[in-house]
C-alpha cells in the first residue's frame, strides 16, 4: 500500500532530478567566471551540508569539528599528488577512507559523551588537528601546499581554461551526497539514527545498538566531507591551514 511517506520520497526524488537538470544548463547561459566560481562553491557547500546532515541532522550528534575531515581530504589529495604523484582521484578516495577511519577512532571516546559535552569535544579535536597541520613541516606547515598545475586534464583533475568541469563535478558531488542521504533516510540505518536522535535510551531498549549507529553515521559523514575537501584542494590548487581555521 502506497503511504504518504513513500509518495513524499518519490516527490523529493523527482524535484531533485528536475533541479539538477536545470542546474546543469545554467553554465551555458552564465559566462562570467566569478559567478561560475560562486556556483561551484555553492554546490560544494550543498554537498557538505548533506554530509553534515547525516551525523548531526538524522543522528542528532551536533558536530562542530567537521573542518578536520574537510582538511584531511584536502591535505591527503594535495600531499599524495605533490609528494608521490598519485592522481587526485585516488587521493580523493584515500582521503575519504582515512577520514572515515579517524572519525570512528575519535568517535570511540567522544560518543560516550552527550549534549554540549560532545559538541565541545568536536571543537577541541578540530582545533588540535588545525595545530598539528599548522606545525607539520612536511605538509607545508603554516605556508600550506601549492599544487603544481600540469595542464587541463580530467586524469589529473586540473582545469585552467574553464571552470565548467569543476562545476559539473561539484554538481555531481552535490547530487551524490543528496542521494546517499535520501537513500539512507529510508534504510535501517536511517531509522536507527532517528531513533537515537529522539531518545537514545528508548532506542537501546528496543534493540538499537546506539554506539554502533553513531559510529556508522560518523564514518559516512566524514567520508563525504573529505571528498568535498579533496575537491576544494584541486579547485583552488592549494591548501592552507588558514582556510581550515575559517571553517573551524
Each model region followed by its residue ranges:
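Transmembrane alpha-helices and adjacent helix-loop boundaries
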Residues: 1-242, 246
Amino acid at each position: 500500500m502506497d503511504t504518504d511517506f513513500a509518495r513524499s520520497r518519490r516527490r523529493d526524488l523527482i524535484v531533485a532530478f528536475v533541479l539538477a537538470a536545470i542546474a546543469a544548463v545554467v553554465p551555458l547561459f552564465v559566462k562570467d567566471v566569478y559567478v561560475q566560481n560562486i556556483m561551484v562553491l555553492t554546490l560544494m557547500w550543498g554537498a557538505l551540508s548533506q554530509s553534515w546532515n547525516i551525523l548531526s541532522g538524522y543522528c542528532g550528534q551536533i558536530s562542530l569539528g567537521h573542518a578536520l575531515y574537510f582538511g584531511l581530504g584536502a591535505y591527503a589529495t594535495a600531499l599524495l599528488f605533490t609528494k608521490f604523484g598519485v592522481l587526485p582521484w585516488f587521493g580523493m578516495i584515500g582521503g575519504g577512507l582515512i577520514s572515515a577511519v579517524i572519525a570512528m577512532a575519535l568517535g570511540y571516546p567522544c560518543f560516550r559523551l552527550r549534549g554540549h559535552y560532545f559538541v565541545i569535544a568536536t571543537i577541541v579535536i578540530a582545533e588540535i588537528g588545525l595545530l598539528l597541520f599548522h606545525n607539520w613541516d612536511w605538509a607545508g606547515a603554516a605556508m600550506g601546499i601549492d599544487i603544481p598545475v600540469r595542464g587541463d586534464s580530467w586524469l589529473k583533475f586540473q582545469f585552467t581554461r574553464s571552470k565548467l568541469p569543476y562545476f559539473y563535478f561539484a554538481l555531481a558531488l552535490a547530487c551524490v551526497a543528496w542521494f546517499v542521504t535520501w537513500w539512507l533516510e529510508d534504510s535501517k540505518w536511517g531509522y536507527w539514527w532517528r531513533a537515537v536522535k529522539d531518545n537514545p535510551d528508548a532506542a537501546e531498549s528496543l534493540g538499537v545498538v546506539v554506539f554502533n549507529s553513531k559510529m556508522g553515521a560518523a564514518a559516512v559523514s566524514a567520508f563525504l566531507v573529505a571528498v568535498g575537501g579533496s575537491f576544494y584542494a584541486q579547485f583552488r590548487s592549494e591548501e592552507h591551514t588558514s582556510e581550515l581555521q575559517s571553517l573551524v
